[in-house]
């Protein structure tokens, strides 16, 4: 049997059981709820608590989005009480990048970002040649799609990345704009 735990709407994976809630911050938060409901939470050790906190922090951009429910912070508090080190996780997730990754981000923001003020949207793209030029490694562009949301008035962004045999597309939004309607 296959159990799928996910916080995204309408997962495409075929499964026997689906545990889903689009109102939570992250899949990690759902896993925490699942462990509570199945009374397995007492088996959570420091390492497992750290993994769940990492998932919550990654999916919320260190609590900058998808983190408006007090229940999320209660879970974070419990994970910290179990030994998860929030500062260490934050450093590893958000302050641990290579120079080439930072230069790729700079190139993307300065040369490859288009702003469409009348649509409150932004678009970014990178070609496979640019990825090669900046010695791209899997994960180097993680979070790039979020940066245009920092521009005043922008509520939707799309990031296109040309891979060897497909184009990877990421969408993000803020406020009441539902990016998942595009995917």
Regions found by a protein language model. Name each.
Residues 1:
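N-terminal small/polar loop signature for handling phosphorylated ligands or for N-terminal nucleophile
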Residues 7-75:
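Short alpha-helices
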Residues 58-183:
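Hydrophobic helix-and-loop "lid/oligomerization" segment in the mid-to-C-terminal part
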């Amino acid at each position: 049997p296959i159990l799928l735990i996910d916080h995204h709407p309408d997962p495409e994976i075929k499964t026997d059981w689906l545990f889903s809630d689009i109102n939570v911050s992250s899949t990690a938060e759902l896993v925490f709820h699942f462990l509570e409901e199945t009374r397995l939470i007492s088996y959570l050790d420091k390492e497992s608590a750290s993994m769940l906190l990492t998932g919550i922090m990654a999916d919320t951009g260190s609590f900058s989005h998808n983190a408006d429910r007090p229940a999320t912070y209660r879970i974070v508090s419990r994970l910290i009480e179990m030994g998860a080190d929030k500062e260490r996780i934050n450093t590893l997730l958000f302050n641990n990048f290579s120079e080439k990754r930072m230069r790729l981000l700079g190139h993307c923001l300065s040369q490859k970002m288009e702003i469409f003020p009348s649509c409150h949207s932004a678009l970014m793209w990178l070609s496979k040649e640019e990825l090669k030029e900046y010695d791209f490694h899997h994960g180097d562009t993680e979070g790039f799609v979020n940066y245009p949301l920092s521009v005043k008035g922008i509520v939707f962004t799309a990031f296109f990345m040309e891979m060897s045999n497909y184009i990877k597309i990421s969408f993000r939004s803020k406020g009441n704009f539902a990016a998942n309607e595009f995917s």
